[in-house]
Amino acid sequence: MLIFAAPSRTVSVLCRYLSFGPSNMHHRLLSVLAASAVVGVNAATTASPYDYIVVGSGPGGGPLAAELDRAGFSTLLIEAGGDEGDNPTFADIGNFNEAANDEATRWDFWVKHSDDPARDLKFTHNTWDTGDGTFYYPRAAVLGGCGMHNAGVCALPADDDWDIIAKKTGDKSWSADNMRKYLKKIEKNEYLPAGNAAHGYDGWLSTSVANNSWAKNDSLPDTKILQKLAELTGQDPDNAANLVNRDLLESGKKADDTSSFYNMVTHADAKGKRSSPNNYIRATLADPVKYPLTVKLHTLVTRVLFDNTTTLSKPSVAPRAIGVEIMEGASLYRADPKYAPGAKCPISQILANREVIISGGAFNSPQILKLSGIGPAAELTKFSIPVVKDLLGVGENLGDNYEGSILARGSAPVESRLITLLLRTPSAPTRKLNIYAWCGAFSFEGFWPGFPTYYGPTQYSCAMVHMAPKSQAGSVRLASADPQDWPEINFRFFARHGEQDLREIVEAADILREAINAAGPPVAPLEERHPCPGGKAAANCTDAAQAEFFKLQAYSHHAMSTCAIGGDGDRMAVLDSRFRVRGAAEDIIAEAKKLPR
């Protein structure tokens, strides 16, 4: 999926790619950019070769650093991981499961889903718990970030989601009408004829789609499932072969509130080669005379530095970020599976003439902010961190999409063909689509080292994502003042309006189950493994039983909103509409892991 943020006074273009589906397409930018600092450096006496320092090379920070450098600003891009751009595991988009499990790029977080340990222990794949949480949550530490190991799905938010930000902040540049141009700026469309006004053809990000000609064959089990889904979601079954080619990146209100099939768009070229920020960064580095971008790999940022004239001794002076403190070396962060306990490297400092930009993602951006003295004062004081700016919202408001699946085994194998569907369930409180689903010969039950489980050649699944969760009660809080330590992460799933969200998920499951069972021979009959072993007629397939299953077995990987953008009257807002940390000096920018929902 792609999300583009309005350019700040720097020239930023922000995008976010999803791993397995546009589940957060209505809610978030995965990279949070935020600037902060600690006291101790006098900028007036120290020169720097860099105008900008960008921390994090993922879909937010990587393209931003390249854009800044191409605009004529000397830019330093800092990445904690290495460069796997020449590794075929990451080059081919179809290798996403292998890529996500590769220790060369993984950061392994362990998170909680609730404040009830007994509840969390009921997750089927909790055997990998390390004691810090029950649920495995993979992240990427590599040049290009998550764009290097995800499944590459590209999607856009609903128009209403852009307009909500514009209304919250009073900044009309966030309006849906204005945001489309950023897709066109970075896209290199490879699946539509040139000249389509909704797309771009000269950007750095290749987009492509699959060949869905199989849908014209009415005898295929996949086609029978497709046609049943059409019937159940108010579409024309006789036109299903054409509907599956609908553009997932199309524009218009109808795309926001009409259940429909789509052809999944991926950030890959027509040959299946991954297109990511890694490519754009490398293309910029390839011309060092024209674009003198500097990249530091295997470098952990421990905090952001303040000019020593902007301390708490002068509360009327807004804190001004002037650089970062770093530790150089591979695998220095505890989440790295190659981390060696006790590993330490020398600390050094790098200064910026203009701005510091943090793009560490939903977990690490708030951690860096807090380690730098920006966050809830009570939490910082607990770890003896000097408070530079008391901002209650840093690390709060954490949310994510709820994900789940129906998994069955057929009487015969089904070819690997993918059905992509966006739908609105009957009890959804608004007209907006609330479920993204994709069906095919795969299994997807969540995340654990080595995922997914292979159930044999007859496996068939419909995975789904709740795109409009109503609870954002989670948090990212410091476990210690050690920058090599991971934070404490608790999503508090279903804490608010959980019954309604679960009702919508169960309704989607019932639709998908009925469609799967329309596959016909030789695939039918199918044996459902979950959520209803034995199928809909089984005694364990009540609405309540299904809701309990999804409550306990839900998983996610689109964390958001821990440094949320908000209006002047929002006490939990961390950033303004130009990605600047609230209460910091004009030259402190944050470019966004933080759509407010």
Specify the residue positions occupied by each region the protein language model found:
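N-terminal FAD cofactor-binding segment of flavoenzymes
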Residues: 73, 80-141
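Classical eukaryotic N-terminal signal peptides for Sec-dependent ER targeting/secretion
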Residues: 1-33
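Intrinsic disorder/low-complexity signature
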Residues: 14, 21-24, 39, 48, ...
